[in-house]
Amino acid sequence: YDLEANQIDVHSVSARKPLFMDESAHDWRLIRLGRRLGWTGVALKTCKTQTGALLGACWAKAHGMTLMVQDLTNPMLAQIPHVLLAAHVGTIAGVETNAMQFYPEASAPEAAVHPGENRMAKTDRPLRVILL
């Protein structure tokens, strides 16, 4: 939602459970606003610009916020900076991505060069990316 237009104080919620900013967290200034409103974490997305994700990660970490990396439809070469960001910023659970699940053939040329990035493993949990 539009965080600037709808400044809802969420401290009462985040006092009970971690609360992650998602779609409105595309700029470090909005992450700052979210933290002021009570959000405790941020879901970074390289599809909103790599620079924005990096600056957001830096600001959030410097202010004690928890990080996730989620881009649900980043296929092909866009997948590479997405997983690299998750590998280096210290997320709570690696990376969330499912472009390979929804349209696996979109990344076939990249999978030939970077096979571990696009291989899915079935577990008793939802599908996850295996990074080799």
Which stretches of residues belong to each language-model region?
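Catalytic core of soluble alpha/beta enzymes
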Residues: Y1-T73, L77-Q79
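Flexible C-terminal active-site loop/helix
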Residues: L72-L132
